[in-house]
Design a protein with these regions (language model features):
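N-terminal hydrophobic alpha-helix used for membrane targeting or insertion
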Residues: 2-6, 53, 294
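A conserved acidic, glycine/proline-rich C-terminal tail/linker
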Residues: 269-285
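Short, basic/aromatic-enriched C-terminal tail that caps enzymatic domains
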Residues: 279-281, 290-312
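N-terminal amphipathic/basic-hydrophobic helices that include classical n-h-c signal peptides
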Residues: 1-25
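A structural signal for short secondary-structure junctions
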Residues: 263, 286-288
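Conserved active-site loop/cleft motifs that coordinate metal ions or position small ligands
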Residues: 268-272, 292-295
Length: 312
């Protein structure tokens, strides 16, 4: 609670150029937008009055084709789509890249306009964590291990802000990318446990030609590191093929770990987990659908990726 309470004193950053502001951002955008809960709900209430369904795509901005694919998936499911842009301080640990995280609301809004998004929601930290805010959501289950080892506050911060956003928007469908697979399962658990009444839909990972998963943080990669980054997906696919070919989980995982250690500057984890729950699996041959997950480092940039694996 001390951590969340401290967030209430933060002044939000102007996503356009990093200047600070207090209150509603004064930004000239072409796309319909809302910066307060009341303005957001007024627009959605008018849609509901016309019998329209609502889809939601939460983002932290710095949008790329992966985000826009999620918007398209939401549009295929619903009559109207809301996308939010909010860089959530509660999911950044001390020393992480909160202040450096790219903010480009004007460019992002242009992309959302082209994707035919119907409304962009731009809450400030004063809206999301007002003075006196004293609530946080503590996640277990699929939130344990993996990303939580390196970022112990991450999923509590994600769960809290996503619960708020889902309550503010109250969509029929919310779309999250498989690129952040553990986060996807955490949010499904959150929606199920709290009876939030929203269908959580998964969007497939969008990749560069060499297999690198699109990520806003790819912008941090220098030219040499960018050349190396595509290895991660290749290593995971080789691991999946080895499992399908009858190698044990222990053998396939160890080979993938060695390949990551040879190809990257650091390795946080390489794991083979149950696809539905992220529970650990026996180290013999794969007997159930699994997910291969890895986190590695190139210089100061941390990359995560995952892929599906099936029994032989």
């Amino acid at each position: 609670l001390d951590r969340v309470g401290a967030l209430a004193s933060l002044i939000a950053y102007d996503y356009a150029d990093g200047r600070q502001f207090s209150g509603t951002p004064m930004i000239n955008l072409q796309i319909p937008h809302a910066a307060t809960v009341s303005a957001l709900r007024a627009r959605i209430r008018s849609w509901r009055g016309d019998g329209l369904s609502v889809g939601f795509v939460p983002t932290m901005g710095a949008l790329h084709q992966g985000h826009l694919a999620l918007v398209q998936l939401a549009k295929a499911q619903c009559d109207r789509v809301v996308a939010s842009i909010y860089v959530n301080p509660a999911q950044f640990a001390p020393g992480e890249d909160f202040e450096a995280y790219p903010r480009s609301v004007i460019e992002d809004s242009q992309k959302l306009t082209e994707a035919k998004c119907d409304l962009v929601y731009l809450p400030t930290t004063e809206v999301m964590y007002p003075e006196g805010f004293a609530t946080t959501i503590s996640m277990t289950g699929p939130a344990l291990g993996l990303e939580s080892e390196a970022r112990p506050h991450f999923f509590n911060g994600v769960a809290t802000v996503v619960a708020k956003l889902l309550n503010q928007v109250r969509p029929d469908v919310a779309v999250f990318g498989e690129k952040d697979y553990q986060q996807l399962l955490v949010i499904r658990q959150l929606a199920r446990d709290l009876d939030l009444g929203v269908d959580i839909i998964a969007g497939e990972t969008v990749r560069e030609n060499d297999g690198l998963a699109l990520s806003s943080r790819n912008a941090y990669l220098g030219a040499e590191d960018r050349q190396r980054a595509g290895q991660l997906n290749q290593i995971l696919k080789q691991c999946a093929a080895a499992l399908a070919g009858g190698q044990t989980i222990a053998q396939a995982r160890q080979a993938a770990l060695k390949a990551c250690q040879a190809g990257f500057d650091g390795v946080d984890y390489v794991e083979v987990r149950c696809a539905d729950s992220l529970a650990q699996l026996p180290e013999g041959q794969l007997a159930v659908p699994a997910r291969l997950l890895a986190a590695v480092r190139l210089g100061t940039t941390r990359l995560i990726d995952n892929c599906a694996a099936s029994p032989s």
